[in-house]
């Protein structure tokens, strides 16, 4: 409030000012580019499949014990709330650097375990320590996400914020593809190089992103005043660049290449990643000093609700529509206790007692989380089907289609008013490919089915991961989204353990102790290994049935929340009509 008062004293009423001057314009776009870089190189959990077999061999553990390590990484996300606690006592850039250092230490320990255990038998790292560093690594990923989320919230108004968040989160899905390109260029036959990159690249990109982040901190509140028309053009350009980047990685990231060709492909990918830098430069040159027509609805006061803007006519209309909806639907079991309006704040206690939350929780738990577990097991799946040589391609496919799924999560905001489908309807539609993929891989376990199934799983889970924050905000209140979303994602470690345990038990039950030569490293190790379709056939069938449950849950959620979205849309139309008539 004090900062806002100073801004008004120095520059007058914010309503008489533009959507941020030249400096504010390029700074907020520079911040967005910084979050894109951070997200693109900090999704280190997505390349677990690239080194999981080697880690299993080095530690001499079973598939079940390996599953515990994957669960530890996902369990770290349950401690994501600690990032919010850190932000209460530390500046944002300090939290970013601390996160990078923690991630560096966690992956450095795993790298030492993988490298030295292969060559020096006397050197061992205790399994509990490896479990702990996997947990820390998973927690650091969640902290990176929080930093990017906060930066987008601080830098963009409510009208532009969903597009900024969607773009930033989308690039997290490309991490595995970028890491694969780096690994192919540096040492394509060594799984350990992924762990080395996991340690170094997030730290490097955090340091690189510091200047725009520090500039963001020095700004007042005036830069929050958006320019919808200008922003729309800039976002269109950024989304085009993002789409080209994703297509580039799909086309070139799937090939087995020579070292020199790999460096050329990597250079091209880095150029595309740097290309959004032209936006801040162009924004400062072509910025039009046009007032924001939606300025009265902007959020200059950080203590005000993010999305609750009700005028008196809105409140009257809302109550009238609530009575109508309750009268028409009150007798249906499906509608009992459902949400009536969007953006209504839910405390944690109220959230736990809300039927719609548990439908949403089930849809996530039986949908996107299954996709995440699939990506963790992709290394063993490829190995069991004699597709180990195609693992790099499969990682690139999963990563790229996860990216496109995340990118598509912006459709509800881009098509707002043109295609009035509730966001929960988009969520249900996104879950449709998931059971199709698992049943396809259950019936036909070969290279082509594996590639198609991996693409569908990546597309579906990517959309849900990116859309989840917006869905949580709309259904249960924007000001409670931090707490409520952290409650939601407790399903990730639970699902990681449960679904991973199913896969591990089926794998170990059908496997046998044998000497296996890794085609990538040439090292022969004695371990429990399973080869053939029997290793994951039952798992694919069970995962398919589970995702059908998630799809059914999302459809019920859509059915229950559709009237609430209709109420909000009608209120928005009424507001626009009232403004025009006045």
Predicted ranges, named:
Residues 1-17, 213-353, 359, 564-582:
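Long, low-complexity inter-transmembrane loops of multi-pass membrane transporters
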Residues 45-55, 248-261, 341-343, 347-404, ...:
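Extracytoplasmic gate region of multi-pass secondary transporters
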Residues 68-89, 105-108, 112, 177, ...:
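Central cavity-lining transmembrane alpha-helices of secondary-active solute carriers
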Residues 79-96, 289, 405-421, 507:
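Helix-to-loop junctions at the C-terminal end of transmembrane segments
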Residues 101-123, 249, 253, 433-445, ...:
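C-terminal ends and interior cores of transmembrane alpha-helices
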Residues 106, 119-144, 449-463:
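Hydrophobic core of transmembrane alpha-helices in multi-pass small-molecule transporters
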Residues 353-378, 383-409, 413-471:
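C-terminal transmembrane helical hairpin of 12-TM major facilitator-type secondary transporters
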